[in-house]
Curated annotation (Swiss-Prot):
Domain of life (superkingdom): Bacteria
Listed GO biological process terms: translation
Pfam families given in the database record: Ribosomal_L23
Protein name: Large ribosomal subunit protein uL23
GO molecular function, one term: structural constituent of ribosome
Species this chain originates from: Shouchella clausii (strain KSM-K16)
Subunit structure: Part of the 50S ribosomal subunit. Contacts protein L29, and trigger factor when it is bound to the ribosome.
Keywords: Ribonucleoprotein, Ribosomal protein, RNA-binding, rRNA-binding
Entry-linked HAMAP family: Ribosomal_uL23_B
InterPro entries cross-referenced by the UniProt entry: Nucleotide-bd_a/b_plait_sf, Ribosomal_uL23-like, Ribosomal_uL23/eL15/eS24_sf
Entry's family note: Belongs to the universal ribosomal protein uL23 family.
Function statement: One of the early assembly proteins it binds 23S rRNA. One of the proteins that surrounds the polypeptide exit tunnel on the outside of the ribosome. Forms the main docking site for trigger factor binding to the ribosome.
């Protein structure tokens, strides 16, 4: 994972994550193998901001049935990133 864009997959846009944006906390889906230091460096490189804190949440895959066969959805990892007070805000809704 040498590329920052391989670590950060997409922003997570939910009701809770939009409320956290008011406190300069942004939520991203990240690669499951990435650690907090790699996530921090990737966000700072892509968006040119200063990150003060990174919290991560691991989700295991859910069991899904297809007829008599059981499969699993992929596991995923979510990162909640706190920006410094002097950092610019990130705008995901630009076209």
């Amino acid at each position: 994972m040498s590329n920052a864009r391989d670590i950060i997959k997409r922003p997570v846009i939910t009701e809770r994550s939009t409320e956290l944006m008011e406190d300069k906390k942004y939520t991203f889906e990240v690669d499951v193998r990435a650690n907090k230091t790699q996530i921090k460096d990737a966000i700072e490189e892509i968006f040119e901001v200063k990150v003060t804190n990174v919290n991560t949440v691991n989700y295991k895959g859910k069991a899904k049935r297809f007829g008599r066969y059981t499969g699993f959805t992929p596991k995923r990892k979510k990162a909640i990133v706190q920006l410094s007070a002097d950092s610019k805000e990130l705008d995901f809704f630009e076209v």
